[in-house]
Design a protein with these regions (language model features):
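Hydrophobic pocket/interface hotspot
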Residues: 16, 20
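A short, ordered amphipathic alpha-helix with a cationic face
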Residues: 14-15, 139
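Short, charge-rich amphipathic segments
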Residues: 101-103, 125
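Alpha-helix N-cap/helix-start and coil->helix boundary motif
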Residues: 10-13, 132-133
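Acetyl-CoA-dependent GNAT
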Residues: 3, 7-11, 21-99, 106-111, ...
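C-terminal "cap" of GNAT-fold acetyltransferases
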Residues: 87, 122-136, 141-169
């Protein structure tokens, strides 16, 4: 059972959104209250991705991972949110919860870095939730390091600190 990576199409986006919400609940429930993760629903997250894709598809790329023809993960890359043309932003890697530890996240990360390289980027950045220790370890094993920058994101009603990580591509 091998993983296949391909560029997402508009037909993938509702399923990507449902996967995204399942991944968020599984990954964040150890440090965020259930009410913060109750919304959006899987369906609403699907429509969020359909809408987001319409205004970001020209400068972002979503890659989906499939195992035996079934969607099991995705990555989303785009330009740096601070405006540095030499830097790419890894917006997201999300997996079906049962897919963790099977190499899919690493395959998506490697593909995202290759995409940035192909687009002329020399540096990559991402934001990771400070409380998400497994994700932080995953990125650190992949060569990412904290930059010292912090910000807060509102997830549901919970203010959630994020840390910026960077690495060369």
């Amino acid at each position: 059972m091998t993983i296949t990576l391909r560029h997402a199409t508009v037909d993938d986006l509702r399923a990507v959104g449902a996967l995204h919400q399942r991944s968020r609940v599984a990954a964040y429930s150890s440090f965020l209250p259930a009410e913060a993760l109750a919304d959006p629903t899987e369906e609403a997250m699907g429509w969020y991705w359909v809408e987001r894709w319409t205004w970001e598809r020209d400068d972002h790329l979503m890659t989906v991972a499939e195992r035996d023809g079934r969607l099991v993960g995705f990555s989303y890359v785009g330009p740096d949110d601070a405006g540095d043309p030499a830097t790419g932003l890894l917006n997201a890697i999300h997996l079906e919860p049962a897919e963790r530890g099977r190499g899919t996240g690493r395959a998506l990360m490697d593909d995202a870095l290759a995409t940035m390289r192909d687009r002329g980027r020399t540096r990559a950045v991402l934001w990771v939730l400070a409380g998400n220790a497994p994700a932080r370890r995953f990125y650190e094993r992949g060569g990412w390091r904290p930059t010292g920058e912090r910000r807060e994101e509102l997830i549901g009603t919970a203010r959630t600190p994020q840390l910026r990580y960077a690495r060369e591509v």
